[in-house]
């Protein structure tokens, strides 16, 4: 049997839960509800009106709900144009007896009235709504104006009056007072409807939804022609709404044994006593709620490509864009690919990758096309999927529009089966791109690129097919999971062409990286970016003649990617064993053909290796102004070695870096990593190549790294362009050399003996004077000789 005090606690807890339930529901979607609330914050009533707010301060309301009533009254003031000639506001509180809190003529300032509302103190007591209405009928609005000014009474109550309210309500309405009722807590809607003016559904509101209540009140005032508060472009709409009244009923739940008395004094006997429980339920009242709805800046759906529009006030918005978009405020493509290439996407559709991963790859592919391409894009796109076999979904360029291309991708079906990436690479290299007839006058020489999307390790070998693809001048970019990074790096060859992700969401975040890589895949060298570049080749016995020839071939292939001339790229070459040899300096060759001939003349040396001496040779004999180095141009040194003999190279390498010269180290084979890392300075500048045979796969990687770093700002005084211990001084985007005992722009001319103690400015003036005297002497002697002639 449940004890009475337990029932009391449960009833209290139940009431606290029920207070969280909504007792008024507008049957609208969340977007419309937000628009109603936003309109409520924008509406302003600006006609002459007398408004009296009647606050229920009884015990049935309680202190908490009374504070919410005050909050509603304060928010209502924000929608009113308060002034002595416009809207005047007063307030009364009632419980057992009515009490004037402040008169309508006490303040004409919105801030002052809100402060007065804030200072109202809860009274407590019985709920005598009828008595408060009679007071207003007898004495009118306290501080009100003549009858010509419309009067509005706003009753904020839970509608649980302890007296008769029908007669006072009729009397109030007979005084031409328009009555609004605003429910608080769990209102008794029947009583609020009886108190309010007609139409009742437009004059009954709910205080807990402040913006909605203000909207409804202002809308009704507009419909009654008492004021015009609907903002421009907004409209009044009617919505179905449900109002709920919380009822409590007493129900017999059983009997229990109890002792009952009898007519005879002192006599009791056992019997059955009834046990009751209280059940709470809602009575529903269907109604129509009239609200003002204003257009939203997001109504026109300005955010493209799946972006989410977030309104910021009446006219502004911002878009939350999916990855790969965000080129402007409306989620337009972030990067429009304008390069001319044949692009083939090769998508893993095997059981190894799973159906879920296949769908993610499809979504990624669609997102990429939407974000990067348009019908005017010069790229030719194709799509293939593979497992045991390869299926061409769309051949290169065989579609009329991006919409048609996306439709083909939508129609892709999961194949299942084994994962044979090597077989697929060989197939698309042979048959995936358009072939040009042998006797055609026009050669289709567009760069060819395959973007491989797979997250798993292949069941067949990928090394041979990947090498075959690169030999056929097919570029490879890999998009894969972190777990498959090793095999994909072997496929693409160049680490910069590898795009990895750790989870499906991060896959979409890699869109910008893929966009960036695609159009830079065919970039040759540094294009118009000036660069002074020196190669340092290990020609020691440890390398051998055959491998040294591979190094020369690597330098040749890399050099082909640069525009060799005095204004763009200059290249120098140093070979070394125990001693270094400058094969040619930066200013030796001014054309590509001449440079290639110079590389071919580099000879194998043999002997032990000293990388440090070679770097000192670069510093003292190659990267100098007298040997063609250009001030204000980025400078880089590429050292190719297996690490032997590099123990003495750390200090010279740091000397180069301290003078603004980048040092890249290509370590081949089973390298001595620690010594080469000290030589490179950081992981960024160390490129590990598994073997001499693999060097060819790293040509693009080296070029791209050097060219990317060559975009960095340059210090004109590093390395020092001043010869013969001159001091370089920066000045306004240029520099000058402060020379001691030398003259010329770079201190290249020795000053004549006897002039060394003169200031530098006098050297040039004295020489000018000597040259002037010589010219005058020549002129005089010439005139004399002419006079001697017959």
From Swiss-Prot:
GO MF: calcium ion binding
Subcellular location, record wording: Secreted
Q: Which Pfam families match?
A: EGF, VWA
Question: Which SUPFAM superfamilies does the record cross-reference, listed alphabetically?
Answer: EGF/Laminin (SSF57196), vWA-like (SSF53300)
Origin: domain of life: Eukaryota
Disulfide pairs here are 298-309, 303-319, 321-331, 717-728, 722-737, 739-747
Q: Where is the composition biased (Basic residues)?
A: 764-778
Annotated GO CC locations: basement membrane; extracellular space
Q: Where is the signal peptide?
A: 1-22
Instruction: Tell me where in this chain the EGF-like domain is found.
Output: 295-332, 713-748
Alphabetically, which GO biological process terms does the record hold?
calcium-independent cell-matrix adhesion
UniProt keywords (A-Z) are: Disulfide bond, EGF-like domain, Repeat, Secreted, Signal
| Annotated stretches, region: Disordered | 758-790
> Which CDD domains is this protein grouped with?
EGF_CA (cd00054), vWA_collagen (cd01472)
Which part of the chain is the VWFA domain?
A: 50-221, 342-518, 532-702
Q: How does it assemble?
A: Forms monomers and multimers.
Name-wise, this protein is von Willebrand factor A domain-containing protein 2
Which species is listed as the source?
Xenopus laevis
- As recorded in Swiss-Prot or TrEMBL, the protein's gene is named vwa2
């Amino acid at each position: 049997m449940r004890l009475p005090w337990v029932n009391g606690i449960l009833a209290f807890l139940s009431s606290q839960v029920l207070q969280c339930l909504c007792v008024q529901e507008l049957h609208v979607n969340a977007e419309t509800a937000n628009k109603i609330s936003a309109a409520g914050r924008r509406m302003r009533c600006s006609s002459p009106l007398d408004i009296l707010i009647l606050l229920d301060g009884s015990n049935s309301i309680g202190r908490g709900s009374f504070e919410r009533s005050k909050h509603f009254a304060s928010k209502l003031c924000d929608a009113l144009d308060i002034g002595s000639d416009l809207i005047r506001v007063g307030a009364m509180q009632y419980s057992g007896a009515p009490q004037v809190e402040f008169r309508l003529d006490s303040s004409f300032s919105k801030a002052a009235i809100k402060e007065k509302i804030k200072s109202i103190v809860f009274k407590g007591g019985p709920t005598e709504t009828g008595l408060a209405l009679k007071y207003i009928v007898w004495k009118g609005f306290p501080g009100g104006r003549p009858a010509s000014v419309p009067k509005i009474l706003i009753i904020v109550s839970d509608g649980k009056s302890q007296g008769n309210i029908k007669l006072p309500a009729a009397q109030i309405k007979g005084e031409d007072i328009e009555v609004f009722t605003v429910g608080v807590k769990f209102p008794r809607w029947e009583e609020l409807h009886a108190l309010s003016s007609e139409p009742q559904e437009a004059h009954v509101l709910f205080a807990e939804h402040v913006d909605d209540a203000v909207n409804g009140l202002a809308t009704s005032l507009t419909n009654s022609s008492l004021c015009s508060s609907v903002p421009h472009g907004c409209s009044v709409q009617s919505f179905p709404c449900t109002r709920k009244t919380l009822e409590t009923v007493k129900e017999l739940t059983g009997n229990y044994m109890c002792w009952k008395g009898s007519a005879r004094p002192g006599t009791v006997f056992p019997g059955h006593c009834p046990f009751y429980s209280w059940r709470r339920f809602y009575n529903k009242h269907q109604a129509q709620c009239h609200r003002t709805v204003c257009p939203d800046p997001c109504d026109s759906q300005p955010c493209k490509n799946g972006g989410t529009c977030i309104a910021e006030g009446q006219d502004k918005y911002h878009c939350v864009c999916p990855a790969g978009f965000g080129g402007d405020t409306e989620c337009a493509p972030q990067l429009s690919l304008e390069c001319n290439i044949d692009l083939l996407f090769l998508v893993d559709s095997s059981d190894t990758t799973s159906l879920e991963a296949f769908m993610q790859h499809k979504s990624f592919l669609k997102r990429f096309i939407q974000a990067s391409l348009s019908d005017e894009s010069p790229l030719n796109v194709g799509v293939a999927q593979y497992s045991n076999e390869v299926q061409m979904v769309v051949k290169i360029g065989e579609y009329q529009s991006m919409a048609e291309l996306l439709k083909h991708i939508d129609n892709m079906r999961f194949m299942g089966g084994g994962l044979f990436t090597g077989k697929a690479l060989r197939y698309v290299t042979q048959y995936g791109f358009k072939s040009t007839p042998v006797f055609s006058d026009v050669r289709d020489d567009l760069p060819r690129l395959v973007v491989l999307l797979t997250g798993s390790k292949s069941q067949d070998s990928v090394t041979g097919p990947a090498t075959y693809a690169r030999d056929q001048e097919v570029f490879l970019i890999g998009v894969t999971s972190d777990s498959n990074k090793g095999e994909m790096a072997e496929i693409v060859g160049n680490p910069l062409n590898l795009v990895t992700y750790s989870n499906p969401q991060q896959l979409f975040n890699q869109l910008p990286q893929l966009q960036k890589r695609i159009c830079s895949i065919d970039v040759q060298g540094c294009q118009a970016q000036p660069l002074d570049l020196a190669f340092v080749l290990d020609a020691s016995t440890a390398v051998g003649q055959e491998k040294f020839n591979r190094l020369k071939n690597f330098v040749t292939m890399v050099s082909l990617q640069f525009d060799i001339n005095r204004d763009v790229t200059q290249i120098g070459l140093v070979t070394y064993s125990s001693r270094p040899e400058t094969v040619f300096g930066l200013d030796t060759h001014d054309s590509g053909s001449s440079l290639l001939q110079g590389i071919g003349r580099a000879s194998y040396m043999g002997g032990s290796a000293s990388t440090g001496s070679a770097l000192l040779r670069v510093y003292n004999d190659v990267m100098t102004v007298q040997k063609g180095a250009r001030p204000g141009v980025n400078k880089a040194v590429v050292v190719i070695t297996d690490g032997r003999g590099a123990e003495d190279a750390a200090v010279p390498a740091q000397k180069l870096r301290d003078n603004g010269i980048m040092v890249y180290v290509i370590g081949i084979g089973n390298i001595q990593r620690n010594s080469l890392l000290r030589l490179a300075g950081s992981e960024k500048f160390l490129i590990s190549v598994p073997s001499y045979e693999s060097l060819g796969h790293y040509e693009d990687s080296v070029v791209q790294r050097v060219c990317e770093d060559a975009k960095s700002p340059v210090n004109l005084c590093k390395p020092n362009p001043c010869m013969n211990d001159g001091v370089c001084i920066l000045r306004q985007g240029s520099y000058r050399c402060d020379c001691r005992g030398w003259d010329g722009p770079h201190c290249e001319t020795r000053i004549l003996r006897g002039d060394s103690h003169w200031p530098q400015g006098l050297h040039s003036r004295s020489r000018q004077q000597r040259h002037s005297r010589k010219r005058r002497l020549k002129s005089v002697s010439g005139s004399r000789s002419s006079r001697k002639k017959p």
